[in-house]
A protein has these predicted regions:
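Generic detector of intrinsically disordered, low-complexity, polar/charged segments
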Residues: 1-3, 37, 193
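N-terminal Sec-pathway targeting helices
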Residues: 19-22
Length: 216
């Protein structure tokens, strides 16, 4: 990915074409696997507190995502735009999948940035999605350091010395398991409108705006 100046970011390391193609086919295989899993997904429990809008809102988006998931990367801008257009909260949960080799650590780093400020955590996740095709385990830290530097921060040598952020990621993953998440992204439109449908899962990102309209 080129920067606005036309030069590649400092952290980018050119990979052999074979490695890039291998990564592409792995992503494709994961997507096909997750698609088959989602076909048998259980209906969400509308009484689960995780599937309710925050206090003061009648409508919200609840998203379970994996930072290494290609479909999550493609859905993220649409979700962001929907939140801004409808002026509704977007509640993001990290749900790193076991077949991905750097998403868990990226989620831990994301929670480190959350601790600095929630907005910084949001921006880090968006940054990782933007550069996702270039990332592999050996350069995840340098990518994260570049983000920190751009925001006038220094990423600690040990990001999570006490395991606090890993525990937060584990808690979000446990929450997803409780809800019944088995694929990413899983996107819910949730509503507290009296007499209305409380939860609607959106499986096609192109139908997100239409789904929000239906829940209003």
């Amino acid at each position: 990915m080129e920067s606005e100046s036309g030069k590649s970011p400092n952290f980018r390391i050119k990979l052999p074409m074979v490695r890039k193609l291998s990564a592409f086919f792995i992503f494709l295989l994961c997507d096909l696997l997750l698609l088959s899993l989602s076909a048998g997904a259980a209906e969400p429990n509308p009484n689960d507190p995780a599937l309710r809008p925050p206090k003061g809102s009648q409508l919200a988006l609840v998203v379970f995502e994996d930072l290494q998931c290609p479909q999550c990367r493609l859905s993220a801008p649409v979700i962001k735009q929907a939140g801004q257009t409808y002026k509704i909260p977007v509640i993001r949960h990290d749900f790193p999948l076991p077949m991905h080799n750097w998403s868990y650590q990226a989620a831990v780093i994301a929670h480190y940035f959350d601790a600095q400020s929630k907005q910084l955590g949001i921006e880090y996740r968006d940054y990782i999605f933007e550069h996702q095709p270039e990332i592999y385990p050996a350069i995840l830290r340098s990518v994260s350091e570049k983000f920190a530097s751009d925001h006038k921060l220094a990423l600690p040598f040990v990001v999570d010395p006490q395991g606090k952020f890993a525990a937060e990621v584990n808690a979000e993953r446990d929450l997803g398991n409780r809800v019944g998440i088995n694929h990413t992204p899983t996107i819910y439109v949730v509503s507290s409108k009296p007499g209305g449908k409380p939860v609607l899962e959106v499986s096609d990102k192109t139908q997100l705006f239409q789904s929000i309209d239906a829940m209003k």
